[in-house]
From Swiss-Prot:
Residues 767-782 have a biased composition (Polar residues). Residues 546-700 form the STAS domain. Residues 728-782 are annotated as: Disordered. This is Sulfate permease family protein 3. It comes from the Eukaryota. It is a multi-pass membrane protein. It holds the Pfam family STAS. SUPFAM superfamilies: SpoIIaa-like.
Length: 782
């Protein structure tokens, strides 16, 4: 494919190897200098750049107000997200403190605030359940390794190691089984794996993955998370969150479920336990939900405009719930479940459980990529709203460093949330110091008023979580705008939603991305092509609709396909070229006056059909001289691969064999180098490759041959028409109506490509008739 001489010519303008090596060594020496290394390390800490320029007089009080407001909203939200993750409530507050504080040093966004996210918490919960069950099963199996299966399951033996009850717990109720094994491990002096251990290991591994994404500049991978994929995924995640919290709202204790399709089992467990609904819990949940609906939907717009300050209805609900539960003793008298003990001390740092990495690798990768996609999406919205630039590459490092450093404290995976990011800005927050004040306020909440949160009912948290999913469910409105115009995007949205709901969060997201990529591949296999024509006003060549082809002067067809010419689209390109030629010639033929329009006498229809058939046959014999000239504009190809280049050569050869002169327009330097480095010019005449479309059109017009004389055309038509007269007369005696229809269809098809001849030579019906009559008389005399 590549020729030795062509490669030499291609790289002949490059400097000698020694000069290149010396230049590289000099650049490496400069990059490894102490000053450059220090500058590179400091580039990972944007705070060094913006903090000395901080405007204390104009920004301090706004950031302080924004931080306190953010802390007020983060208290109930953090506790609620901890319940989704399946860890103690205080860890939700820790998650709102440490990542947000660390992001100040590494982030480039002034408004992004890191914290828990419902979808990530649910994905983390699934990984925790998987690891806890695996660990419990593995430990439990070691106690029975020396026993046979019959001994373990002996129904008649009262000392059987595994009873039917225990077996049912393993198969149907993971909750009791995991808890019993955990208690047994504590009894025997073995430190069991806690849920927070799994969560911290996940955020550590996810942070490492995000750092590597930053090193290799893989932020472009977030482009795979199209808006439709993320919308369907987030809405599907909202469905998972709803069924994860509905049990707490109803006061039903449901068994743990995890793995693909666990949502079906969760729904079945919910239906089976409807008889166990706790009425006091339902009343508290319903009243809490109605309070949020009334306050957030009806009172909030009026109060926000009146006080110019967002009212924290969630915090008001938490205070009311704690007060009512404490003084009415709801947990003691009516068995209403509450949050429980919250430590009032600063957690000591500890290492993650590295031995769990082999169990959570895939989960951590899915969580890492999802967190990056959500964070970059929020960053883009913030960029657009507040009109400043965010370094997306540095944001990958920021997420990674925050994850790795936060894993030394009891936290779970985090990302940005749009509501959390703008709530501080709504009251004046304008820099990253907003997160600093928020973290300090949350820390004071834990150390000072943490014990008061012990009386918060869990059903109130569940009501807050389910109400928060309302915004996600509003994304169903996107389908209405997608369906009329963007049907493929509509399908991607629905597939992402159904895969997330029906399968699982992590696996469903990966399959949704795969489906979106598949639709992209299919669309590259069916690229759009169009004709080009000259604009008389600008003298440039523009896209022309197929119905406007008859307005184009001349017989030079300009073809352009706007898509990569690669292995997925090469067959489509070949088909499109021939389709272009066919439509061009048919349109040019139909644009001239037909014989039916020249002679409307119905008595001459049979002769007209014979004459059109004769013209069609003559045109077919002469087509190698009068077919259109094709110009292929290669600037529509972003890039061309090996098969695409072979397709170009094959199309050129086939067009030449069919009598169609083919010309190419190439302006891109990369494509020119590709042509010269390969054997392209051994197949294609280099004189037929041009830099501009206008030059190619002029060259094509010079190749058009002069038409036949009128006498030659009429003589040929009359000769062929005489033969057709005899053949059609013989066939008509034995044909039925269907045969006549077939002949008429064939005649019509032939006339479509032959009427150009009559227009070019101004042939009339009378001339052809007289010539044919004289020809018949000569034949009769013979």
């Amino acid at each position: 494919m590549y020729k030795k001489m062509s490669l030499r010519q291609l790289f002949s303008d490059r400097p000698p190897l020694n000069a290149v090596l010396q230049e590289k060594a000099q650049k490496l020496r400069y990059a490894c200098s102490p000053s450059k290394c220090i500058h590179s390390l400091l580039s990972f800490l944007p705070i060094i750049t913006w903090l000395p320029k901080y405007d204390w007089s104009h920004s301090f009080f706004g950031d302080l107000s924004g931080g306190l407001t953010m802390a007020v909203f983060s208290v109930p939200q953090g506790i609620a997200l901890a319940s989704i993750t399946g860890v103690p409530p205080v860890y939700g507050l820790y998650t709102a403190i440490f990542p947000s504080f660390l992001y100040i040093f590494f982030g480039t966004s002034k408004h992004n605030a890191l914290g828990g996210f419902a979808v990530l918490s649910l994905m983390t919960h699934g990984a925790i359940e998987k690891v806890m069950l695996r660990t419990a099963t593995s430990y439990n199996a070691t106690a029975y390794v020396n026993h046979t299966l019959d001994e373990l399951l002996d129904k008649e033996n009262e000392t059987a190691l595994i009873s039917n009850t225990t077996l049912m717990q393993i198969l149907g109720n993971e909750t009791s089984f995991v808890e019993e094994v955990t208690m047994e491990m504590w009894t025997e002096g073995v430190t069991p794996v806690k849920q927070i251990h799994v969560a911290t290991t996940i955020i550590f591994l996810a942070g490492v993955i995000q750092v590597f994404m930053g090193v290799f500049r893989l932020q472009y991978l977030t482009s795979l998370f199209s808006e439709q994929v993320m919308s369907g995924f987030v809405v599907g995640g909202g469905i998972h969150v709803f069924f994860a919290q509905i049990g707490n709202m109803l006061g039903i204790e449901l068994p743990r479920r995890s793995g693909p399709g666990y949502l079906y089992y969760r729904i079945w467990d919910l239906v089976e336990n409807l008889d166990n609904v706790h009425i006091p819990t339902v009343c508290i949940s319903l009243s809490s939900f109605l309070f949020l609906v009334f306050g957030k939907e009806y009172l909030a717009p009026w109060l926000n405009s009146a006080f110019n300050y967002p009212v924290p209805f969630e915090l008001v609900l938490v205070v009311v719930g704690i007060t009512a539960t404490n003084y009415a003793e709801l947990s003691l008298r009516h068995d209403v479940k509450v949050v429980g003990n919250i430590p009032t001390e600063f957690p000591p740092p500890s290492l993650p459980r590295f031995d769990l990495i082999r169990h959570i690798g895939l989960n951590a990768a899915a969580i890492a990529i999802t967190a990056v996609a959500i964070h970059i999406t929020v960053a883009k919205v913030v960029e657009k709203r507040y009109k400043y630039k965010i370094n997306h590459g540095q944001e990958l490092y920021a997420l990674g460093f925050v994850g790795v450093l936060s894993s030394f404290f009891p936290v779970f995976p985090v990302t940005s949330g749009f509501a959390r990011s703008v709530v501080g800005a709504a009251v004046g927050g304008s820099t990253q110091l907003t997160c600093l004040f928020s973290s300090l306020a949350l820390l004071s909440v834990i150390l000072c008023i943490g014990p008061a949160l012990e009386y918060l009912p869990q059903c109130i948290l569940s009501a807050m979580i389910i109400f928060a999913q309302k915004g996600m469910l509003e994304k169903f409105g996107e389908l209405k705008s997608l369906w009329p115009v963007f049907k493929i995007d509509f399908t991607i949205w629905l597939m992402s939603f159904f895969l997330t709901v029906c399968y699982d969060m992590g696996e469903g997201l990966l399959m949704a991305i795969g489906f979106a990529v598949l639709t992209t591949i299919i669309r590259t296999q069916r690229p759009k092509w169009h004709f080009l024509s000259r604009d008389d006003d600008t003298e440039n060549y523009k896209e022309t609709k197929k119905r406007d082809l008859e307005r184009i002067q001349g017989n030079v067809c300009i073809f352009r396909m706007d898509a990569p010419l690669i292995f997925t689209s090469s067959d489509r390109f070949t088909m499109s070229v021939w389709q272009c030629v066919k439509k061009w010639e048919r349109c040019k033929s139909e644009s001239f006056v037909t014989i039916e329009q020249m002679n409307s006498d119905r008595s001459a229809d049979i002769f007209d059909s014979k004459l059109k058939s004769a013209r069609r046959r003559w045109k077919r014999d002469q087509k190698s001289e009068n077919r259109c000239k094709l110009v292929i504009d290669c600037d529509g190809f972003p890039y061309v691969d090996y098969l695409g280049l072979s397709t170009l050569k094959s199309v050129y050869v086939d067009l030449q064999a069919a009598g169609i002169q083919c010309f190419f327009v190439v302006q891109k330097s990369d494509l020119k180098k590709l042509f010269r480095a390969t054997d392209f010019y051994e197949v294609v005449d280099e004189s037929k490759v041009f830099n501009k479309v206008g030059d190619a059109v002029k060259a094509a017009e010079q190749h058009i041959s002069s038409p036949k004389t009128t006498k030659e055309i009429l003589t040929a038509l009359a000769s062929i028409a005489t033969t057709d007269t005899v053949l059609i007369d013989e066939e008509s005696s034995d044909s039925n109506d269907n045969d006549d229809a077939e002949i008429q269809e064939r005649i019509t098809e032939e006339s479509e490509n032959s009427e150009e001849v009559m227009s070019e030579t101004s042939v009339s019906i009378e001339d052809a008739t007289s010539l044919t009559s004289s020809r018949n008389s000569i034949n009769s005399e013979e």
